[in-house]
Amino acid sequence: MTVQPFSPDSDLTLDEAMDELVSAEDFLEFFGVPFDQDVVHVNRLHIMQRYHDYLSKAGDLDEHDDQARYAVFQKLLARAYLDFVESDALTEKVFKVFRMHEPQKTFVSIDQLLS
């Protein structure tokens, strides 16, 4: 799917246009963020989760017009993408599974098993 960056002259609102986006590549193209397909292929879920995390921290943007929101969304997506250009998923620890401590080891003696 070829996606065009958002235009304020469009018949669609920003939210309506974003409803059509289905992949990380769609988001990157829509927001005009240049990307390396190899980076996205390996890190797409991490990039999108980091983008979501950045959006959550940005607070409520609904009071702003589409053009201002587009600029903020674009900046945050570019930042999320660059996190994985400059680093990797294991280092960035976006998902909980990467932040978990080592599994706990418990010793059970033979005596305990036999009793």
Swiss-Prot record:
Any GO BP annotation: nitrogen fixation
Record-linked InterPro entries: NifW
Keywords carried by this UniProt record: Nitrogen fixation
Matching Pfam families: NifW (PF03206)
Family assignment from sequence similarity: Belongs to the NifW family.
Self-association state and partner proteins as the record states: Homotrimer; associates with NifD.
Cited function: May protect the nitrogenase Fe-Mo protein from oxidative damage.
Protein name per UniProt: Nitrogenase-stabilizing/protective protein NifW
Organism the protein comes from: Azotobacter vinelandii
